[in-house]
Structure formats: C-alpha cells, structure tokens
Amino acid sequence: GKPCDAEAVKKCLEDLVAVHERAAGDLKIDSMEADGLVLTIHTTEACPSLMNYLSEPYGCIIDVDEGVTEDGIVVGTGPFVATELVTDDHLNLVKNENYWDGNVNVDEITVRTISDGDTLALALQSGEINAAYGMAYASYPVFENDNYQFTSVQTSRSFYVQMNYASP
C-alpha cells in the first residue's frame, strides 16, 4: 500500500470537511501543514475537543485517491482489508499482507450486524459468534461469569476536560 504520512492524512481531512458538514463544523480547520509524519492543524477558533472529534467514526483516515467503492468499502490503514460489505448484514475482512506493523495473526474476520438483543445474546452463547458489542442490559447477567470476558462502559465515547484556573 501507499505510505500513510502527514500529506495523506491532510488530503483525507480536506476531503472530509469538504463533503461532511458536521465534520467541518466540529473540526473548525482553517489550514493544515504536512511535514513528513507531522501534521499541524490550525483552527479558526480554539477547539479543545479537536482530538475527540478526530476520533469520531467520520474521522477514519482513508486513501481518498482510492475513494469509496459502490458498496461502501474504503482503503484504510489497519491490519485488515475489507472484501465485502453488505449493509445491515455483514462485513468480511482478510488480513492485510502489507500491514505496516508486520504479521497479522488472524487470517479473516466476519463482522455481523445483529440488531436484536436476544438474537445477539443467543449467538454469543451458542458460539456462533466470538465477540459482541452493544449487548442488551437484560442479558448482562448471562455473561458475567468465568466463561466470558465481559466489559461494560456507560458510553462508547469519552472526553477529557482540563481547566486553566489561572486564565480568565
């Protein structure tokens, strides 16, 4: 694949704010400077949540030269390559032979969309799936035991706030 340097990230973010109204409003990008692996972002105003916004799902860094396929697949920077996307059903991934961080120890992954909470719980219990996200609260007791590794957080997003009490 192509290198993911600051110029590639800059190009991706320029495209993002051009086509995504919310991203443009959130990020408040005035200008950017790319230098090797360092990207400097200048904003139109103070934007203390910039790092949080860059980690939003819309902020995924993709190869904009490759674009988005008709079925929604993009070229990214991760350890897997998408081979098939069927909206509201599944996403098939295979290991990226050119992954920058070396060998990927899983050959393929299928990410299934299971929107019904009971169906999701039953699929996990039966071994049909190996992991789940967005489990219904009512199902928690079933998985809070030694047979499962269960983690729960109140939100999928977190924010860091710092106050400067020395400045008015």
Label every model-predicted segment:
Residues 25-27, 141-152:
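Ligand-binding "clamshell"
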Residues 53-104, 108, 118:
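Gly/Pro-rich hinge or "lid" segments in bacterial periplasmic/extracellular proteins
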Residues 2, 98-142:
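Ligand-site clamp/hinge motif
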Residues 27, 36-38, 75-77, 88, ...:
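Extracytoplasmic
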Residues 14-21, 55, 98, 125, ...:
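Sec-exported extracytoplasmic/periplasmic mature domains
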Residues 1-20:
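Aromatic- and charge-enriched surface segment that lines or borders ligand/interaction sites
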Residues 94-97, 155-168:
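A bilobed periplasmic-binding-protein/Venus flytrap-type ligand-binding module shared by bacterial periplasmic
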Residues 22-64:
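Surface-exposed binding/hinge segments that line
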